[in-house]
């Protein structure tokens, strides 16, 4: 088994794991305590950044969750998860993939750090970046008017990558993220068996 994915519970690793599960891929999953650079220092020998997810596929090594997910659908497809250049929604598909991390997940990383890892150090940043994240959901909420999915009238990688930000918002207690259209959309996505399985993977320390 050449394909390996390293991840932590509730991390951005959910994106490629969910993608792999939807595609029925054969892969090895290594779950670690968060953050692994602190609690599993030997991981730095595998990924010098100490970040998750990390994917190894033969000689290929990748560190970015959206890029890994896109690699999987393009390398191991064809898959309906991919929107191809000949489809009308291809530009929107690409935009949502980049939007998922650059626009949505970025402010959440600040909240995660100062709410869970270093509580009390920067409470103003937690409040400010939480508001900033919620304000950035306008486009998503509007796009989901009368839509079940983001692109091409089907479930795609765009739904996987963007919805992770909402899943993380729930974990961080940012309840304002669940606007009506977004809640309807995520209720549907998060009931998918592949997502439920992906969320169920946990680090189990050796006894």
Protein language model features and the residues they cover:
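A generic structural-conservation signal
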Residues: 29, 153, 178, 198-199
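GST-like domain detector, emphasizing the conserved glutathione-binding G-site
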Residues: 1-127
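Long hydrophobic alpha-helical segments typical of transmembrane helices together
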Residues: 182-207
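Active-site-flanking alpha-helical
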Residues: 73, 165-166, 199
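GST-like fold's C-terminal all-alpha helical module
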Residues: 97-191
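Conserved beta-strand edge residues that scaffold enzyme active sites
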Residues: 33-36, 158, 203-204
């Amino acid at each position: 088994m050449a394909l390996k994915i390293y991840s932590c519970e509730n991390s951005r690793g959910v994106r490629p794991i969910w993608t792999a599960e939807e595609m029925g891929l054969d892969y090895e999953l290594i779950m670690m305590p968060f953050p692994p650079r602190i609690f599993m220092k030997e991981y730095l020998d595998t990924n010098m950044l100490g970040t998750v997810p990390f994917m190894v596929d033969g000689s290929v090594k990748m560190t970015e969750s959206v890029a890994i997910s896109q690699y999987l659908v393009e390398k191991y497809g064809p898959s309906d998860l991919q929107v191809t250049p000949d489809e009308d929604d291809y530009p929107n598909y690409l935009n949502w993939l980049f939007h998922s991390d650059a626009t949505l997940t970025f402010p959440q990383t600040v909240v995660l750090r100062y709410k869970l890892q270093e509580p009390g150090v920067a409470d103003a940043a937690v409040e400010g970046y939480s508001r900033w994240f919620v304000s950035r959901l306008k486009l998503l909420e509007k796009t989901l008017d009368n839509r079940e999915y983001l692109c091409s009238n089907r479930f795609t990688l765009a739904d996987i990558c963007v919805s992770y930000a909402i899943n993380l918002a729930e974990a961080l207690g940012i309840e304002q993220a669940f606007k009506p259209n977004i809640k309807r959309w995520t209720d549907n996505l998060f009931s998918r068996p592949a997502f439920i399985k992906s969320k169920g993977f946990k680090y189990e320390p050796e006894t």
